[in-house]
C-alpha cells in the first residue's frame, strides 16, 4: 500500500494571492467596474477563488451580486489570470525541499485544489514543481469541488493508497471540511492565506505546521502509526 501526501495549492504550496487579485482587477477594468482589489485589504478574498474575487468587485461596485454575471465573467477572469499567473506567485519557503524529501522517501504526492486543472497545471509548471506530483485534481476533474470529499478520495484511490496511509495538507476551512468528510488526517498550514486572512479555529486538528519542515515531521508521525517505511 502506498503512502501519500496530498496538498492544496493556493496558500499551501505557493503564495498566489497577488496574481489572483491582479487578475480580478484586470477583469474589472475590462468590464467597467470601478472597484479595485488591494493586497492588504482583499488578500483573504483571493484564497476563496476566482468567483469570490469577482463577487467582491460586483458587491463593492453595485451593492449586490448577480450570480449569473459571476458565471459569465468567470471564463474571462481565467483567461486573464493565465497571462499573469506567475508574475508574483512564489513557493513558500522550504516547499521545494519538502517535496524533494517526500519523493526521496517514496511518499507519493498529489494536489487537490479548487483551482481549475488547466490553471493548476500551468502554475505548477511555472513554479517548477509539476513533476513531483503523480496526480493533480481540480474541481473540473470529477465535476465537484472541495469541501465535497470526492476529489480527495478519488485522488487517494488513484494513488493506490487508503485514508490511513494518506495525509492532506491545506490552509483553509474548506480543506479541513474536505478532510473531515473524507476521514483523512489533516495538517493545517499556519502560514497560508486561509489561516492568516480567514476566521479559523485551529483547534480543529492536532496537526499544526508553522513551516515546511514541520509538515515533514508531522507527516512522518502520522504515517508511522500505520506504515513502517522510514
Tell me the role of every PLM-derived stretch.
Residues 2-96, 101, 105:
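N-terminal helical cap/lid subdomain that shapes the substrate entry/recognition surface
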Residues 206-214:
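Short acidic-hydrophobic, aromatic-tinged amphipathic segments that line or gate anion-handling sites
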Residues 168-207:
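Acidic, Mg2+-coordinating phosphoryl-transfer loop and its flanking beta/alpha structural elements
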Residues 34, 129-134, 162, 206:
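Conserved H-loop
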Residues 98-125:
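Substrate-recognition element of Asp-dependent hydrolases with the DxDx(T/V) motif
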Residues 146-176:
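Conserved Lys-Pro-Asp/Glu-containing loop-to-beta segment of HAD-superfamily phosphomonoesterases
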Amino acid at each position: 500500500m502506498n503512502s501519500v501526501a496530498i496538498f492544496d495549492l493556493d496558500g499551501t504550496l505557493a503564495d498566489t494571492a497577488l496574481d489572483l487579485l491582479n487578475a480580478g482587477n484586470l477583469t474589472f477594468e475590462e468590464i467597467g467596474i470601478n472597484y479595485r482589489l488591494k493586497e492588504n485589504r482583499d488578500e483573504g478574498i483571493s484564497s476563496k477563488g476566482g468567483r469570490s474575487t469577482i463577487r467582491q468587485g460586483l458587491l463593492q461596485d453595485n451593492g449586490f451580486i448577480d450570480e449569473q454575471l459571476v458565471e459569465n465573467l468567470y471564463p474571462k477572469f481565467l483567461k486573464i489570470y493565465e497571462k499573469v499567473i506567475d508574475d508574483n506567485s512564489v513557493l513558500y519557503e522550504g516547499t521545494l525541499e519538502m517535496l524533494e524529501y517526500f519523493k526521496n522517501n517514496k511518499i507519493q504526492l498529489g494536489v487537490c485544489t479548487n483551482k481549475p486543472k488547466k490553471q493548476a497545471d500551468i502554475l505548477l509548471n511555472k513554479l517548477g514543481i509539476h513533476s513531483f506530483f503523480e496526480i493533480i485534481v481540480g474541481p473540473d476533474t470529477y465535476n465537484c469541488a472541495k469541501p465535497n470529499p470526492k476529489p480527495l478520495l478519488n485522488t487517494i484511490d488513484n494513488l493506490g493508497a487508503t485514508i490511513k496511509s494518506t495525509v492532506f495538507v491545506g490552509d483553509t476551512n474548506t480543506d479541513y471540511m474536505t478532510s473531515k468528510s473524507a476521514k483523512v488526517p489533516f495538517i493545517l498550514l499556519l502560514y497560508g492565506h486561509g489561516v492568516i486572512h480567514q476566521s479559523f479555529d485551529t483547534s480543529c486538528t492536532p496537526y499544526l505546521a508553522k513551516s515546511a519542515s514541520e509538515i515533514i515531521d508531522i507527516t512522518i508521525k502520522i504515517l508511522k502509526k500505520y506504515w513502517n517505511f522510514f
